[in-house]
């Protein structure tokens, strides 16, 4: 068979979050489908109607399809991954990033322009990607605690739809982060990671597999591997004042890790023990509150359509060419 028309069309489950990114998906469904080359996919389209719905859709329907494509923000991708993994389904994942920040898309090199992202999926090129596990719940790129980490899920959806990324800036810095920094309260935590132990007062912590967190903190691409079985553990020790907190934010963005007040470690398993229940954020969504958090890396747990990228250690075999 030498032509697209002679090839079997692949069955694609398209999960659409109609509220993502200024309601772009709600208004432009036909544009989304038309972005793909003709004759490549047979689409079944399912809309999410509430938080957690993409988990249910992926879990209940994905095994009937050759691939799953999610259209929305990082939270929609998170739910899609959770649904696939809970069902034990290993079909490749396509991502059309239409959220307000799209941190993971930036890391993976997935275009934010719809047609380019669709063409990438149609090309068939995938990479094996590490997924995080937090007390049995999967996350695609970051788990974190501390001031400012609630910004994404505390920002009203209407504000996100109206202002996009600017909504995070307004809600984050003026309505949430500044008041939080005015009342800096470190947590006393015991941290075990890969056979090592830390115990001290900490202000912030994250466990991530990304070059960008919340669109604000940037890590050097040379420090990150997306499929090496390790995530990056970032810890900020107790700070003396709100002014010191702003200085620390600046140091994080400059990647000035001194190993004392600002700790940067690669690890495959981390256990946090808090004296009081602590709220966690997973991929920008509320991850619950608990005194003990067990984090681990699930090495190359999913296959995601993405371009060749030096942050991937392994060369993934290309899916059967579709165009």
Question: Model-derived features: where do they sit?
Answer:
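ATP/NTP phosphate-donor binding region
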Residues: 1-71, 311, 318-323
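ATP/nucleoside-binding phosphotransfer catalytic cores, i.e., glycine-rich phosphate-binding loops
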Residues: 2, 193-194, 199, 225, ...
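Catalytic core of DAGKc-family lipid kinases
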Residues: 48, 86-203, 207
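Short conserved active-site loop signatures built around small residues
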Residues: 54, 74, 205
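Short Gly/Thr/Asp-enriched flexible loops that form oxyanion-binding sites at enzyme active sites
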Residues: 76-88
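Short hydrophobic-aromatic micro-motifs
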Residues: 137-146, 150, 199-209, 213-214, ...
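Gly/Ser/Thr-rich active-site loops/lids in small-molecule metabolic enzymes
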Residues: 159-168, 212, 216, 221-241
């Amino acid at each position: 068979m030498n032509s697209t028309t002679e090839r079997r069309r692949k069955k694609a489950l398209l999960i659409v979050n109609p509220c993502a990114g200024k309601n772009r998906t709600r208004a432009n469904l036909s544009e989304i489908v038309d972005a793909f080359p003709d004759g490549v996919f047979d689409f079944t389209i399912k809309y999410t109607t509430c938080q957690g719905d993409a988990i249910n859709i992926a879990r209940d329907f994905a095994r009937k399809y050759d691939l799953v494509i999610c259209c929305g923000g990082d939270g929609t991708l998170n739910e899609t991954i959770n649904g696939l993994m809970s069902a034990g389904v290993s079909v490749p994942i396509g991502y059309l990033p239409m959220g307000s920040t799209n941190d993971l898309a930036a890391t993976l090199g997935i275009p934010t322009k719809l047609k380019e992202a669709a063409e990438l999926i149609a090309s068939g090129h995938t990479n094996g990607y590490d997924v995080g596990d937090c007390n049995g719940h999967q996350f695609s790129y970051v788990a974190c605690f501390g001031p400012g980490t609630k910004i994404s899920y505390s920002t009203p959806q209407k504000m996100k739809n109206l202002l996009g990324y600017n909504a995070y800036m307004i809600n984050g810095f003026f309505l949430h982060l500044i008041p939080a920094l005015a009342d800096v309260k470190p947590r006393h935590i015991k941290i075990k990671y890969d056979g090592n132990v830390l115990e001290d007062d900490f202000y912030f912590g994250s466990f991530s597999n990304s070059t960008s967190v919340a669109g604000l903190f940037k890590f050097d691409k040379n420090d990150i591997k997306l499929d090496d079985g390790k995530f990056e553990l970032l810890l900020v020790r107790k700070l003396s004042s709100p002014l010191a907190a702003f200085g620390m934010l600046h140091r994080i963005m400059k990647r000035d890790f001194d190993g004392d007040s600002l700790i940067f470690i690669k690890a495959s398993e981390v256990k946090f023990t808090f004296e009081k229940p602590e709220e966690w954020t997973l991929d920008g969504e509320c991850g619950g509150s608990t005194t003990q958090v067990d984090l681990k890396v699930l090495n190359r747990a999913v296959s995601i359509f993405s371009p060749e990228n030096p942050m991937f250690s392994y060369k993934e075999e290309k899916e059967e060419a579709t165009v």
